[in-house]
Amino acid sequence: MTKESADNYYNPLMLWGYDVFVQVLTNSFWWRCSTKGILVPFFLDNSTTNHMEVGAGTGYFLRAKLDHERSKLKSSDDKTLWPQNLTLVDFHERCMNKAANRISPVRPNRVLANIMEPIPLKGQKFDSIAIMYVLHCIAATPEAKGRVFANLKPFLADEGTLFGSTVLGKGVKHNLIGGFLMWLYNYIGMFDNWDDGKEDFLKPLREHFEVVESEVVGTVLLFKAEKPRH
């Protein structure tokens, strides 16, 4: 997705309805990868107190993490240890503001950037980097999207984990409504993923990281990578 199309689609009304339509309906029935059953546990398991969130969206997963950590507290007076350091990276300021407001009073760092280019954030290392439901929105060939991992690698600590998810267009079977949504989203420019297959992402991940794990659930690729190559 280009900056111009993001401005058109990620408007306040769309962001308001995103969680219901995507996180509840689309993921469960049409992408067939449950938000509560698959994606939230995946995020909780891999995110740390020193975290970079790439493509913050509505802040849905960040809020789930914050609520999860708060549920562990013995008293309402206790303060959660999450996050100690949180940075949001997005090329759309409206999404970053939405996500930041959702996890108030947490005050994350905000970096406005295009992840297809080097990210203007020097000298920082994170124990976890998440890129959830971002890659299928990038207007680029599958091969070009691999640059994202090269651009994120410098910010991952040696013992850290980069993880994410993306809707695939190749090598998976979409149901009737899922196929229609794929056509619609690609037609209007919200998605650019008809040619995105599992190996298109695993290949560059293996080039940049020593340990790569993946799983396809429904039409969604889940991946995690560790031990960045130097």
UniProtKB/Swiss-Prot annotation:
Methyltransferase; part of the gene cluster that mediates the biosynthesis of aurovertins, fungal polyketides that exhibit potent inhibition of adenosine triphosphate synthase. This is Methyltransferase aurB. Pfam families: Methyltransf_12 (PF08242). SUPFAM superfamilies: S-adenosyl-L-methionine-dependent methyltransferases. Disruption phenotype: Blocks the production of aurovertins and accumulates the unmethylated precursor produced by the HR-PKS aurA. It comes from the Eukaryota. Its EC number is 2.1.1.-. GO terms for biological process: methylation. Belongs to the methyltransferase superfamily. It is an enzyme of class 2 (transferase). It comes from Calcarisporium arbuscula (Dendryphion arbuscula). Keywords: Methyltransferase, Transferase. The lineage of its organism: Eukaryota, Fungi, Dikarya, Ascomycota, Pezizomycotina. The keyword Methyltransferase applies. The keyword Methyltransferase applies. The gene is aurB.
